[in-house]
C-alpha cells in the first residue's frame, strides 16, 4: 500500500462582493478630500492644490535600505500559452495565474499605515486581474490573510483576435491609495494542443531544457478534479490549490542518479531522460524518462518533441515499469501493465497521465525609501544586463532592461551616479570613483563589490540582482571630465572601446548574482 504524503491545508476563500473595474485606477485617491477625510499617512497637497515636491533619496536613507532590505515584491506566475475559448465555452487558464506578495515590506507597510491611523481593512492590499482587454471584466483577487491568490476563472474568447497578450494586475490599498498596475510576461494564444507529430519548426510550442514547466492531472477531463504537482513541507504532493514551477533538465542517458548532475541543452523529446527540480525549494524527483501518452497507454518508441499541453507520462528510470502517479493528494509510484498485443505500449491509469505546459514569472520589487509617495510605484524598471563601456579614466556602465524612465538614477551601493536616460530599454551612467566607497583610496587596493540599484526622483528604490565589482589596480587613474561631457551630449553613442579592461589592463566587472540550485532527490513511495 502506498504511504501518503502530508496533506496540504485547504482554504476556502470568503465570498467577496463582485466589483467591476475596466478602466485605469486614479493615481491619487485622496485628492479632493478634506483634511479630516484624508488618511493620516497620505501626503497632503500644497497651497492651491499643488503637490509638494518629491523627496529625493538621501544617502542615509539608502544606507538604511541596504541594511534592512524591507522590499515589497509582486510575483505573477502564469503559463506561457493559453487555449482559446470558442462560442459560449470558457476554457479557464490552466494552471491558473497566481499572484504572490513577497518580502518583509508588505508587513512593514501595513504596520506603518495602521500607526498612521488606518484601520486593518484600509491597510489591506487589494488586487484585480484581467487579460488587458477593456471589454472583459476584471476579477477581484482575495488576498485577505495570505500572501497569494489564484485567478481560476480567466479565459480568452475567439472574438479576441490577439495572438499574444499580457495579464494586468491592478493593486491598491483598502483606503484607495494606489500601488500600481503590474503586467505579466507575454502569453501566446493557441487554438488547441497539437495532435500532429511536432517539429522544431514550431519552436515556441516546444519545451527547452532548463526552462520551467507545470504539470497537472485532470481525471476524466473534469475541471474540478484538476490537481497540480507541488512541493510543500519538503514533500511532493498533488495540490488542488497551488501549482509548482519545475525546471525540466535534459540529461544524458548514462547520467547516474545523484544530487549533482550534468545537464544538456536542446529541446525535450519523448524517450529522453529528464530531471524535474522545484524552482522554489530545489527538491528534485529521481531520473525520469518522459513518454508520450495515447489514451491510457504510454508509447515506448515515440521520439518527437514534447509540445505545450501534451499529455505525457514519467517513467522512473531503472525500475520495473514504475510511473509517477497521483492518488488523491499523494504522489506515488504506479506499475504499468505491458500491452499484450503491442510491445511498444504500456498501460497506465489516469493518475499517471500529466499535462505539461511551460510557465513564466514576472517579478517586480520596490521600496518607498523616503516614505509614502503620491504616484503609483509602477512602472517598475527591470534591469536585465550590464555592459561596461570605455576604458582608462572613463568607465561607463550601460544598463539594458525594461520600463526605464527619465526620472530614474543609478546608484552604486549608497552612491548616486551621474545618469543619462536613452530610451525605455537603455540607460547609461558614469561609474563612481572608488574613493566614493573607500575614503582615502586613490585606486582599488582590494576587490569591492557594490549592489546596483535604480532610484526614482521621489525616493522609490528598485533593487536589482546585479552587482558591480571594483578589482585591484596597480596605481591611481588620472582624473578626466570626459565622462561628464559624454553624458551632457544628447547622443546615444558610447565610447568605442567595449572591452571590460581599462587602459592599464585592470578589470572592473559588472556581474549578476546567480545562485546555483542544489537539488535534493525525493523518494517516490510505492
Swiss-Prot record:
Function: Transcriptional regulator that plays a central role in Notch signaling, a signaling pathway involved in cell-cell communication that regulates a broad spectrum of cell-fate determinations. Acts as a transcriptional repressor when it is not associated with Notch proteins. When associated with some NICD product of Notch proteins (Notch intracellular domain), it acts as a transcriptional activator that activates transcription of Notch target genes.
Protein name (database record): Recombining binding protein suppressor of hairless
Annotated region (Disordered), positions in chain: 1-57, 491-526
Effect of residue 128 to R: No effect on interaction with L3MBTL3
Subunit structure: Interacts with RITA1, leading to nuclear export, prevent the interaction between RBPJ and NICD product and subsequent down-regulation of the Notch signaling pathway. Interacts with activated NOTCH1, NOTCH2 and NOTCH3. Interacts with MINT/SHARP. This interaction may mediate the recruitment of large corepressor complexes containing proteins such as HDAC1, HDAC2, NCOR2, SAP30, FHL1/KYOT2 and CIR1. Interacts with EP300, MAML1 and PTF1A. Interacts with SNW1. Interacts with CHCHD2 and CXXC5. Interacts with BEND6 (via BEN domain). Interacts with NKAPL. Interacts with ZMIZ1. Interacts with RBM15.
Biased composition (Basic and acidic residues): 48-57
Keywords from the named record: Acetylation, Activator, Cytoplasm, DNA-binding, Notch signaling pathway, Nucleus, Repeat, Repressor, Transcription, Transcription regulation
Skewed-composition ranges (Low complexity): 508-526
Compartment(s) of residence: Nucleus; Cytoplasm
Outcome (variant: residue 425 to R): No effect on interaction with L3MBTL3
Highest taxon listed in the record's lineage: Eukaryota
Effect after changing residue 422 to E: No effect on interaction with L3MBTL3
Gene from which the chain derives: Rbpj
PANTHER family registered for this protein in UniProt: RECOMBINING BINDING PROTEIN SUPPRESSOR OF HAIRLESS
Location, primary (coarse class): nucleus
Family matches, as Pfam families: BTD, LAG1-DNAbind, TIG_SUH
PTM annotation (N6-acetyllysine): residues: 201
Biased composition (Polar residues): 1-11, 491-507
One GO CC annotation: nucleus
Location of the IPT/TIG domain: 381-471
Chain positions covered by the region annotation DNA-binding: 83-93, 191-196, 218-223
Biological processes per GO annotation: angiogenesis; aortic valve development; arterial endothelial cell fate commitment; artery morphogenesis; atrioventricular canal development; auditory receptor cell fate commitment; B cell differentiation; blood vessel endothelial cell fate specification
Alphabetized GO MF terms: chromatin binding; DNA binding; DNA-binding transcription activator activity, RNA polymerase II-specific; RNA polymerase II cis-regulatory region sequence-specific DNA binding; RNA polymerase II-specific DNA-binding transcription factor binding; sequence-specific DNA binding
Cysteines engaged in disulfide bonds, as pairs: none
Family statement: Belongs to the Su(H) family.
Organism listed in the record: Mus musculus
